[in-house]
Each structure stands twice: as C-alpha cells, then as structure tokens.
C-alpha cells in the first residue's frame, strides 16, 4: 500500500492504494501541474519550466502519510478533500469531497440528512462536486483549472453530457448547490467572484485571468476569496463569471417543483417538462409552495396567486409567507440579502440557474437565483459543473 498527497497553488490530489495505482495518479497530477504552469506563462508572462527542476517540484508537492490522513473541518459535520476522479474516457476531473451532514448541523434545521446525500432513497456518506466550472473535452465536461468554462449549451444537453461520463456522474443539482451555499453561510465565507468584467465589484484588486474577447475568467484563476470557504482548495467561481445550472428545481405556472432529495443526480429520474420525477416543494406542514409576482414584488406563498408576472429584486426584499426547511436546504432564501432573485411566475416552465455572471455586480452571489429561463435556452452566460457519487 502507498499513499500520496500533492499540492500546487491550492490544487491538491490525494491517492491511496497499490503502488502502481498511486504512481499513475502522481504522474497524471504532475502532468497537469506542468500544463498549468505553461498556461500561466502564456497568460502572465512568467513561470518556471518544471522540467528544469523536477526533483525540487516533487519534494515540494509530496507530503507525508500524516498530512495525507489529516482532514480539514469546514463546518460541523462537513469535511472535504480534493481528489482527482477519472471518467469512462480516462480523463480526470478535480473534485471536492463533501461528507454527509444533517440539516441541524448545517443550518439548525431538523436531524434529517441534508437532501444532497439522499439519492434514490439511499443515504450516501459522501458526494463529490467539481472544484471548477466545467470545460468540454470531446463532448464531456471536466473540472480543470485555468480553462474556459463551457457556455452556449442547454441544461438538458449539459446534463446528458455529464451522464455520459459514466455511472455516478451528473450535472450539479439544486440540492448540491444548496449544500455549498449553506456551508458558505455557516462558515461566514460567502464567496466573492468575477462580478465586474474579470474583477470583484467589492474590491477591484480581486481579479481573475480574463478570457480573450470575453469578460469571463479562466476557471479557478481568482484569489482564495473566490471559493466557497475562502481557501485556495475550495470550490471556485460560485459567485459571478457565469450562471450555473442547478438541475432539479423549476417553477411551472407559478408553482415550485423539485426532484425528490437528490434524485436529479440519477439519469432514470424523469425531469422532462411532463416527467413524473417532479414533486411539489412544500412548507413545514406539507403544503405546496407558489410564487406570486406583483408590482415588482416577489412573494413565496402556500396558495396559488392570480398575480403572475416577471420580477427581479434582491433576496432581502423577497417576502416569505411560509416556513419551509426544504427551501432552506436548497438555499432558496435570503442567506445573502443583496444577492439577486429573479422569478417568472407566468404560464410555462422555467429552470433554476444560480450564482450570477460577470456583469451582475452586487446582485451576484452563491445565493443568487434565477427561475426565469426556459429549459431550451442556451446562452453565452449559462454553463455548469458536474458532480459525482459512488453508487452503492
């Protein structure tokens, strides 16, 4: 048995197993380190050639067994690691492992396991979320640093591309985004990001590497404050840059619907417009929830409303005439009061995207949400990230 932990500017890889397996993981990681350094040289004009001092690099990034076993505590009940997971094409994605947590541990709710860890009626001890907004390689999405995030794709096409990576792979779900947002709120580390054309609107010194002929930034190129826990190894770019698909929540004819728990992670869950995988989002007493829009005001109610329109405002101005732990677990509440909430409660179906984009300014944030785009939309500001669970 062998163990290894590699680190490079906040990018980490841990492996444990047979020596041959660990050696392959280390070689792959070092290859990506060199690619990253070369890309930095192209974009920034400075970087060391890793071939000049490979032994020094190896000594710097290889840690001992004790460090490998160490786990950073991010919130009560939540631990994470950064690992490389390979798909059926043999290409790795850099993924963040989150361990099972209850609503009580995360935000003071019930002792129920957070829905992100309940898939197909089974409770999972851990799930994996892409560290980076995904880029496309041969039609499959990957979590890799310093890449251009994929955009101009519909949610369903992106979801199918995620499923094509193999068992357990899926488009990030609304439940998983809720876990990220609630964790950030618990930690007091609401992420900054590219909200002002490669800069953070709150501090122009916080900047990512801008993509040519675009205001988007390369994945993971911002500072540590652009992650969910304000560490270099956190989940990057949840605030701004591009709106991200959060599969498994929608509004239809003014009513709120969701996949059960984290069943949106399963390809067999029918989340087509008329699919049977949709369940009403409810309050504490089981009443279905609706959204009324009138006079530029958004109100969450337990009854349907004749006031159905489109509106955007900040979460701090949204009226919540209901008590719903489900909404709290999905981070559909004013956890970030200045983050935007956009709702179209008119006739039709509108999917959930989250986070905001490069020009959203103060309305961007991990709690920013938009239920105002049909599932057929493919925009230059819409993209996503994959997630993974090891099926029982």
Regions found by a protein language model. Give the residues of each.
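Short aromatic-cysteine micro-motif
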Residues: 112-238, 242, 269
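Charged, compositionally biased non-catalytic regions
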Residues: 45, 53-80
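Short secondary-structure boundary/capping segments
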Residues: 185-190, 250, 260-261
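C-terminal, surface-exposed recognition/capping segments
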Residues: 55, 59, 63, 178, ...
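Extracellular adhesion/carbohydrate-recognition regions
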Residues: 79-168, 253-298, 385
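Compositionally biased, non-globular sequence tracts
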Residues: 1-57
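Carbohydrate-recognition beta-sandwich/jelly-roll modules
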Residues: 72-81, 85-121, 281, 309-311, ...
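A short local loop/turn or secondary-structure capping micro-motif enriched for an aromatic residue
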Residues: 22-24, 252-255
